[in-house]
Amino acid sequence: MDVFAALGDPTRREVLRRVAGGPTTATRLALEMPISRQAVSKHLSALDEAGLVERTVSGREVRYSLRAEPLSDVVGWVTEVGKAWDQRLANLKSRLDR
């Protein structure tokens, strides 16, 4: 799964937001969210596949932490799209002001 597909789901975005607060487990996330531990694990798996989280196994516990590097692709894309729309709006304003 690519970064954009992973971020396309609002629940995954919320899981990622919570993981960004510091390393955590699926069990802890499930206690904080209105979804089951199995659902949290499914979303964490998708985020892991997209490279957005890192899994660290310690005994029986699996902790997840944020990997921010892939988000630079998102920031770059959003910046490009934003510039394109700014230019289009400036062109429209120019035409309307004539």
Regions found by a protein language model. Give the residues of each.
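Short, hydrophobic-biased segments on the C-terminal half of alpha helices
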Residues: 44-45
